[in-house]
């Protein structure tokens, strides 16, 4: 027998499988040695000058597509949760969606326009605690924004290399002659980051997505706990775990 919110669980499980696929795709990209360095020597009347160049291969389009799949499943898990909470309350789940809005002043109206008010006062109180608006819970709002972005344009993550090659500057006779020592394509510390246009500058792709998946999982669990109590309106507002109140830090910290 299926338990409450099992459809949402399925979407979260799919998001986790896509995360594994994403890590594999990024691993293949890094293994391909996408960064190369070279020294350009320029001869002129005043002598020689040298330019150092770094060439970075683009990240595979598959990476952006997989990210879109992860976000789509997370948003679907939230919408399925909203609809099932309405059904549990004995109401019609037609046109029911998880509410997102710009600010707290818009939240009550958005709850009604997305028909989530049919889920009952406790479910609404739980949702309000989540602060699903831009100035409230940034991590939750990011899921909404990325879902819209994925529908409108391709998601193209950026690659960064934090390493530089070892360069020998002089020949044995003292002549300046910069040369890269060893393989100019290896090793490199490569990080895959969110593109600037989605508002997540400076955040590593995989750790941030892992946080978002866990956040949605926690939200579903909170609503499941409410559903198991029978949605009684006289029990007072639900209490959320502290981890549901977390937000994305300014930058994802290094592991």
Walk through the language-model features, giving the residues of each.
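Acidic, Ser/Thr/Gly/Pro-rich intrinsically disordered interaction regions
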Residues: 1-255
